[in-house]
């Protein structure tokens, strides 16, 4: 969210209306026929649409890999241990609330649900889950909760984007999640050339450091 606002909103001379949400929600909106000049989804979703003949040939570009991590409120001194599955289990089980994105529509939310079940603590923590439409909203709500013992789990881009929360670290290897996000021009775009210019700016080498700072690792 922060990356696209910064690069597409400020650095190119076109007006850009941005619509953010869980990737499955965005995918479903596109399929439903909502007007769209640029699509930023997981690589798997973009490839699916490309195979269906929905994407302008040659317009697909990878923005980067995004990993999933654990966050706390920025104003707490807490530094929970998440270095392995056992410590992560203890940390999550002891949290007063666990803030995460939509567990049906978002990449990270689906992963969190599976992780809690695999750790064997779902039944213990399910009443403490605070689920939100996307990770950025989840992080903002964690900050506004004034609960110093809360934990957030979402993609690092959404943690970095929210100044009022702090990234503790990435999920341990047993639960590592790295998702490739890609951008493309849909065939129903009414501004295909402007869309291609936006992709060139967003994914160009000159903005590699900006993407890295926003939480996107090079593909």
Describe the role of every protein-language-model region:
Residues 1-20, 24, 28-32, 43-66, ...:
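Exported/periplasmic ABC-transporter solute-binding proteins
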